């Protein structure tokens, strides 16, 4: 007697026409989607007869990387919000980085990776940069050596985000006048939840 999974697979194959992988580990591509057949709970089925199904599409890819391409003085807007703005987007797969606000908006619940590198130049003040999640600081980095002409505040983290959550960089302390060039802000979806 056929189980639900076997009937689903037969029904899908019948609707899509013939689709064969060369071996059991190759995915079967049906109408642009990748159908992956795997054991959904290997510890509960020592015989290896249970099957689980996972369907993924290319739209699951999420990544961005933005930089400051020029030195400039902070704008009136950035002086009010203290958000660090990035004027050149190098990568924006999924279009979830809002370049006007320099804010990443999570398209789905998942684990995300973020890293930043904010450079201060010829500035004797200590700077503190924070990665903000919905207005709350998650991690911070400092650059405060008064004897060097260039120094960076850098950090990275994995965080769980819900759909619609916002992440951005905020200057919590100091100023970046005269040296934003070479600063970067990047992130990507590690895996959805």
Swiss-Prot record:
The keyword S-adenosyl-L-methionine is annotated on this UniProt entry: no
Chief location of this protein within or outside the cell: secreted
Region (Essential for interaction with NRXN1 and linker of two C1q trimers into disulfide-linked hexamers): 34-38
Region Necessary for interaction with CBLN3, and homotrimerization: start-end pairs: 62-193
Region feature Essential for interaction with GRID2, mapped onto this chain: 122-147
PROSITE patterns: C1Q
Disruption phenotype: Mice (reeler, weaver and staggerer) show defects in granule cell migration and parallel fiber formation, synaptogenesis, Purkinje cell dendritic maturation and establishment of adult cytoarchitecture show a correlation between the formation and number of parallel fiber-Purkinje cell synapses and cerebellin levels. CBLN1 single knockout mice show a major impairment in motor behaviors. Double CBLN1 and CBLN2 knockout mice exhibit gait abnormalities, impairments in balance and coordination and develop seizures.
Expression tissues: Expressed and secreted by presynaptic neurons, such as cerebellar granule cells. Following secretion, the protein binds to GRID2 on the postsynaptic Purkinje cell membranes. Expressed at the highest level in the cerebellar cortex. High levels are also seen in the olfactory bulb, posterior part of the cerebral cortex, certain thalamic nuclei, and deep cerebellar nuclei. Low to moderate levels are detected in some hypothalamic and brainstem nuclei. In the thalamus, expressed in parafascicular nucleus neurons and other regions (at protein level).
Effect seen on changing residue 79 to Q: No effect on its ability to form homohexameric or heteromeric complexes with other CBLN family members. Increased interaction with GRID2, NRXN1 and NRXN3. Loss of N-glycosylation
Gene Ontology MF: a single term: identical protein binding
GO biological-process terms attached to the record: cerebellar granule cell differentiation; establishment of localization in cell; heterophilic cell-cell adhesion via plasma membrane cell adhesion molecules; maintenance of synapse structure; negative regulation of excitatory postsynaptic potential; negative regulation of inhibitory synapse assembly; positive regulation of long-term synaptic depression; positive regulation of synapse assembly
Keyword Transcription regulation included in the entry's annotation: no
Post-translational modification: The proteolytic processing to yield cerebellin seems to occur either prior to the secretion by presynaptic neurons and subsequent oligomerization or in some other location after release of the mature protein. In the cerebellum, cerebellin is much more abundant than [des-Ser1]-cerebellin. Sialoglycoprotein.
Keywords: Cell membrane, Disulfide bond, Glycoprotein, Membrane, Postsynaptic cell membrane, Secreted, Sialic acid, Signal, Synapse
GO cellular component terms attached to this protein's record: extracellular region; glutamatergic synapse; parallel fiber to Purkinje cell synapse; postsynaptic membrane; synapse; synaptic cleft; trans-synaptic protein complex
Quaternary structure, from the entry: Homohexamer; disulfide-linked homotrimers. The trimers are assembled via the globular C1q domains. The trimers associate via N-terminal cysteine residues to form disulfide-linked hexamers. May form oligomers with CBLN2, CBLN3 and CBLN4 prior to secretion. Once secreted, does not interact with other CBLN family members. Interacts with GRID1. Interacts with NRXN1 and NRXN2 long (alpha) and short (beta) isoforms produced by alternative promoter usage. Competes with NLGN1 for NRXN1-binding. Weakly interacts with NRXN3 short isoform and not at all with NRXN3 long isoform.
Protein's job: Required for synapse integrity and synaptic plasticity. During cerebellar synapse formation, essential for the matching and maintenance of pre- and post-synaptic elements at parallel fiber-Purkinje cell synapses, the establishment of the proper pattern of climbing fiber-Purkinje cell innervation, and induction of long-term depression at parallel fiber-Purkinje cell synapses. Plays a role as a synaptic organizer that acts bidirectionally on both pre- and post-synaptic components.
Name of the featured protein: Cerebellin-1
Organism the protein comes from: Mus musculus (Mouse)
């Amino acid at each position: 007697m056929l189980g639900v999974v076997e009937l689903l697979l037969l029904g899908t194959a019948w609707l899509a026409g013939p689709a064969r992988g060369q071996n059991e580990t190759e995915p079967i591509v049906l109408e642009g989607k990748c159908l992956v057949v795997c054991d959904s709970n290997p510890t509960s089925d020592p015989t290896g007869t249970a099957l689980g199904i996972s369907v993924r599409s290319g739209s699951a890819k999420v990544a961005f990387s933005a930089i400051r391409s020029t030195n400039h003085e902070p704008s009136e807007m950035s002086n009010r919000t203290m958000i660090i703005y990035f004027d050149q987007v190098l990568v924006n797969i999924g279009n979830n980085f809002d370049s006007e606000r320099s804010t990443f908006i999570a398209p789905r619940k998942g684990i995300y990776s973020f890293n930043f590198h904010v450079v201060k130049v010829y500035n004797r003040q200590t700077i503190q940069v924070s990665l903000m999640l919905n207005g709350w600081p998650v991690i911070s980095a400092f650059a405060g050596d008064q004897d060097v002409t260039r120094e960076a505040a850098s950090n990275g983290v994995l965080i769980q985000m819900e759909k619609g959550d916002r992440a951005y960089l905020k200057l919590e302390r100091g100023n970046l006048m005269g040296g934003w060039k070479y600063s970067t802000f990047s992130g990507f979806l590690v895996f959805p939840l």
